[in-house]
Amino acid sequence: MAKHGKRYLEAAKKVDSTKFYSVDEAMKLAKETSYANFDATIEVAYNLSVDPKQADQQIRGALVLPNGTGKSKKVVVFAEGPQADQAKEAGADEVGSDDLVEKVQNGYLDFDVVIATPMMMAKVGRLGRILGPKGLMPNPKTGTVTMDVAKAVENQKAGQVEYRVDKQGLIHAPIGKASFDADKLAQNFDALRDVILRARPASAKGQYIKSVAVSATFGPGIHLDPLNLD
């Protein structure tokens, strides 16, 4: 079992591990238990009663949080013609086609999000070994393979987050920074909760949300009642 440092243990004393906190209480406590020497990310972790091995239970998607994430994203777009122009106008940090493919092949990875038009995916596919392990491959489910590249860029710049259930049935997603007001964190939490509830597979059995917790970077987990997330 990993040993925790003094600052973590001091933060953990503020959390009652035997109780469930309301959303508002949890957001305030996540801020209070943030002890990093930078503006920590507040993250939520859902443990879902799904089997990701089943195709119809692979929960994945994206949403624009009402108050953003507090993080500035660098966005690159693979597009040609009018879509390339639209991506530039929308604020993409880099736009290209074969030239951008070559640039990435030569080591360029200074970006957080990759967007592509459907026609460009054959070319982007050549970058699978580079982008795939970093979770950067464009995907229609997250709105990053689209003809409306301008909207996709705007969404990313506005604070879009992706969520995806892993092999253990867990979803981890950021909902803001420790510097956010607690009510803004709560609004972001509510938005993510709503899409996860709507994404429940028809074939999922039993209690859908088994547990949910929020925490600041390096901070202790703060548990909420999975049956009462209002």
UniProtKB/Swiss-Prot annotation:
Entry keyword annotation includes Transferase: no
GO cellular component: large ribosomal subunit
The protein's role, per its UniProt record: Binds directly to 23S rRNA. The L1 stalk is quite mobile in the ribosome, and is involved in E site tRNA release. Protein L1 is also a translational repressor protein, it controls the translation of the L11 operon by binding to its mRNA.
Keywords: Repressor, Ribonucleoprotein, Ribosomal protein, RNA-binding, rRNA-binding, Translation regulation, tRNA-binding
A Pfam match: Ribosomal_L1
Listed SUPFAM superfamilies: Ribosomal protein L1
Family recorded in the similarity comment: Belongs to the universal ribosomal protein uL1 family.
Superkingdom of the organism of origin: Bacteria
GO terms of molecular function: rRNA binding; structural constituent of ribosome; tRNA binding
Entry keyword Glycoprotein: no
Native source species: Lactobacillus gasseri (strain ATCC 33323 / DSM 20243 / BCRC 14619 / CIP 102991 / JCM 1131 / KCTC 3163 / NCIMB 11718 / NCTC 13722 / AM63)
InterPro entries cross-referenced by the UniProt entry: Ribosom_uL1_bac-type, Ribosomal_uL1, Ribosomal_uL1-like, Ribosomal_uL1/biogenesis, Ribosomal_uL1_3-a/b-sand, Ribosomal_uL1_CS
Subunit and interaction comment: Part of the 50S ribosomal subunit.
Gene Ontology biological process terms, A to Z: regulation of translation; translation
Protein name: Large ribosomal subunit protein uL1
